[in-house]
A protein has these predicted regions:
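Surface-exposed loop/turn positions
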Residues: 33, 66-67
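C-terminal lobe and adjacent flexible extensions of AdoMet/dcAdoMet transferase-like proteins
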Residues: 129-135
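A short SAM/SAH-binding and catalytic strip from SAM-dependent methyltransferases
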Residues: 35-49
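Class I SAM-dependent methyltransferase SAM/SAH-binding core
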Residues: 1-26
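A short acidic, Gly/Pro-enriched loop at the edge of an enzyme's catalytic core
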Residues: 25-37
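C-terminal alpha-helical "lid/dimerization" subdomain adjacent to the S-adenosyl-L-methionine
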Residues: 52, 67-111, 115-128
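A short glycine-rich, Lys/Arg-flanked "PGG" loop and its adjoining helix->strand segment in the class I
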Residues: 52-64
Length: 135
């Protein structure tokens, strides 16, 4: 099901929910309107400049003390390095490869997030990062 189709389906099943569409880089939502934001295997789809805009938007949308939780690609350990490279070559774009070269926790700190914590998963091929908007 395409994203718009999924949104239509959700609207039919839950007519009381408000539907908001926009770009992750500049969402049409109020500042400090969320206590938590989750980004799951999405950031690697954005070029670096747009990825920074997405993260700045997340910081803007979080209320003070609010949490960002994200899961995305990380350079794999020795056993999964070749499979990860093959997967990226066959199924991903250059943006995924670029993300594997970057230090996402440091990027989050430079953007103004605090309490940044990283956990490596799946043979180091994925990372789960939590961070907060300072109070």
């Amino acid at each position: 099901m395409s994203p718009p189709g999924a949104l239509d389906f959700a609207a039919q099943r839950h007519p009381s929910l408000k539907r908001v569409e926009g770009l992750a880089e500049d969402p049409p939502l109020a500042d400090a309107s969320f206590s938590a934001i989750q980004l799951s295997v999405a950031l690697h789809e954005f070029p670096r400049s747009d990825r920074e805009r997405v993260l700045r938007s997340a910081l803007r949308l979080l209320e003070p003390g609010g949490w960002l939780v994200l899961v995305d690609l990380h350079p794999a350990g020795p056993w999964l390095k070749l499979p990860q490279q093959l997967f990226c070559a066959l199924f991903e774009t250059d943006t995924a490869t670029a993300m594997l070269e970057d230090d996402l926790p440091t990027e989050l700190e430079q953007l103004g997030f605090s309490s940044v914590s990283q956990e490596l998963l799946a043979g180091r091929a994925l990372q789960r990062i939590t961070a907060t908007r300072p109070r």
